[in-house]
Amino acid sequence: MKSQKLKTIRTAVRAALLIGSAALLPILPSAATQSMAPGRQVAESGPSAPATGIRPQGDTEISIDMSQVKNPDLPKIFNYIDAHIDEHVRNLQKWIQQPSVSNTGEGIQESAQMVKGYFDQLGCQSTKVYDPGIAEWGQQSNPVVYAKCDEGAKKTLVVYWMYDTMPITQPDLWTRPPFAGDIVEQAPYKKVLIGRGAVNSKGPQMAQWNALMSMKAVTGKLPVNLIIVAEGDEERMDMGYRTFIKAHPELFKGADAMFVFGGQLGIMGGSEGCLFIELTTSGKSWGRGPVYSDIHGANKRSVDSPAWRHIKMLSTLAAENGNKVLIPGFYDNIVPLTAVEKAKLAEAAKKMKPDEAAKNLGVARFIADKPVDIVTMSRYGTSFNVDGIWSGNMFPGGSGAILPNTITSKHNIRYVPNMTGPDIVKKLRAYLDKEGYQDVKINVVGDVPWAKMHYDTDIAHAVEKTFKAFNIDYQQPLEDQASILGGYWPAYLFAGDPINIPIAGGMAGSGGGAHSANEFYVIEGAKKTYGMAGAEKSVAMTLYNFAGSN
């Protein structure tokens, strides 16, 4: 029996714009394989929910090497986290229960205030919700939440958050209500939390906040000063964040580095480039077919179709099932991988099991067969994706003959050094014009340039030291400045002028299903994957490492 909530969500989703976003491709090995079968519910959520009985260590087979824990406060913080893990999981459930869908606006304003409340509870002296106004590409931005916490420490760390999520596009596929935060069993884990935003990115961010609150509870202060900035437009190409950062660089004065959430596969900090566009074909611009509105579908017998023209146009942009971009000059500016980078990718590929990775991602198979090719494509590949397409009769079931007058498709285009978004748009426009599609409109929704990562920095060393102490088999760093990139996020706003600080991320913990049905975050770990308690402890240790206190 479908809940009324899911029916409401389904109705809203039909009207939503389905804009794609970034998530790291989980292709490296982990203990998890995402089961798409319904999980067995083991705990309910809500204010009157009973104690969840979380086992902090779960079934994780690896543990912290306490000989590498030098600061006497850290064992106390670890014990506090274990003792309060039920409460910490409930904190995440409450956050999941507050929708924050940036593409529809559902719950965005409430979520911004909720995040400000988290920063207030942390004791930050300055917290504020900013309205960035109209973004560069003409859309209304969502709020940015800023906090500054002066702990009297020597170093200051910027922490990046995003509080927005993707819409629920396939409600019937969810085994639990997407905004309930239910805890279920999902092999090999005894407890995972199901919910929109569970892994992307409320789960790891709540682990960070729980860790910060635990440090405050045990020691009364944090080992570093913090500047925390949370955006509500990550799933909309960071449009408001871009406006905010460019308008207020002074708010980051004195920052030494940035720490971002992440998983235990490796140290991250770089970002691929991502251009998001809409392509529109209309009878009015074309001069053929319906001009002012849709008309009866029977008229196709004698009237041209903008929809068919659009489909033909799309077929000229890519070949090989969409895996090869045909736009002239598209690949021209790509900087080849170095010998060291190729060697590291080959090393990482040895740990990869394609079948297991495909199952974890929820796909039948990857484009390539060889692990080294899959790893290389996922970390330094380019793509021209079809995120969605709509026109005419979009009503589920039934019939109804319509000849649409307009058709629009959405595309995220992933790019790497030294490609640029504006250059891609310029080449696309020239190619469409050459092929006779001068009437096709290109609308730039957003553009996030790529950013490389420096590994020889204090913050990167702090994360690496934590991974070693936690016995995490992570991907080893490459040479100092590497072109091996992560999924897109607005790293470029901090890696370049005027802020220009080193960036690194990575923490224990795991999850899956970002942007998908049954998105989950691991609560009790298994095998070589830590659960939420381990994730929180790793955050605490990284901050102490960065402060030079461990």
Q: What is each stretch, according to the model?
A:
Residues K2-P29:
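Gram-negative bacterial Sec-dependent N-terminal signal peptides
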Residues Y163-M166, V229-D238, F261-L265, S285, ...:
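Acidic, glycine-rich active-site loops and adjacent beta-strand->loop/helix elements
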Residues G39-G107, Q125, S271:
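N-terminal hydrophobic or amphipathic helices/low-complexity stretches enriched
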Residues T280-P354:
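Polar, glycine-rich mid-to-C-terminal structural blocks
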Residues V192-E272, F276:
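Acidic/histidine-rich catalytic neighborhood of metal-dependent amide-processing enzymes
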Residues G152, L326-T406, R414-A430, D439-N550:
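An extended, acidic, His-containing surface patch that forms the Zn2+-binding/catalytic region
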Residues N91, V101-K155, A180, A187:
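A non-catalytic alpha/beta surface segment that caps or lines the substrate-entry region
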Residues K154-I227, K528:
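Active-site metal-coordination/substrate-binding segment of hydrolases
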